[in-house]
Amino acid sequence: MIDRKCKVTLGGLPQKIHVKGDETKPVLLFLHGGPGVCNRHTVMTVHADLQKDFLVVAWDQRGSGGSYRGAAVETLTIDRLVDDAHELVLWLCREYGRKKVYLLGGSWGSELGTWLAYRYPEHIAAFVGFGQVVNGAKNEELSYQFALEEAQKAGDEKSIAVLKRVGPPVMGVYKGGFDGMMAQRRVMMKYGGYSQSKKKRSYFRSMVVPMLCSGEYSIPDLIGVAKGYRYVLTAM
């Protein structure tokens, strides 16, 4: 069994990965969402069953978590992240004696995985996307409408005022940029829009607490988590 955390230089930037599982199994690279929302803690806990069939690799993409330090804003582009992912695939093939790896991507990770599989199919055994991005702008329209309708049903005037202040997204972008998006997300999560769970949790309880309690991240990693989310999303 392997349980290895290390940094791999991709596109000139040292980036954090966690490799865990049976070295004899096929390699599965997990592509997180956001961009900028690393999820090593969920990959290694919530998705731990994947280790029965795969050597699982969780990666903090450029600008996030353990890959925050030194990530210049001009390098935060889709093309650069696709190239980073390809370089990581090649490194994994060399390191573990494989010809191809499997990809699993959620939300933004599904978009990244689609580009990666399209450009470099010779190194990809298969790609599975969940929460697959097809039309990001439409996603945001539906998300905003859901949050507004739920707040109206609940008579939640405070949340309604917040949503009307940021306004409906235009081409997927909220008024106020990152801050406007986060204001919408807090209302959406308040009314259960984050997952199908019947439990309605705040952004802090849904996203922050699991990271802090997981033990997956070092202090520098957590600083990268806190700073990287805004940094990457604003840049991209």
Feature locations, PLM:
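Short beta-strand element of the alpha/beta-hydrolase
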Residues: 25-34
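A catalytic-pocket lid/entrance helix-loop region that shapes and gates access to the active site
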Residues: 124-170
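A short loop-to-beta-strand scaffold at the N-terminal edge of the catalytic core in hydrolase folds
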Residues: 10-20
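Conserved alpha/beta-hydrolase
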Residues: 50-69
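Alpha/beta-hydrolase
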Residues: 157-236
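The serine-hydrolase catalytic nucleophile loop
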Residues: 38-47
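Conserved hydrolase catalytic core segment
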Residues: 98-141
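Conserved acidic catalytic loop of the alpha/beta-hydrolase fold
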Residues: 80-100, 115
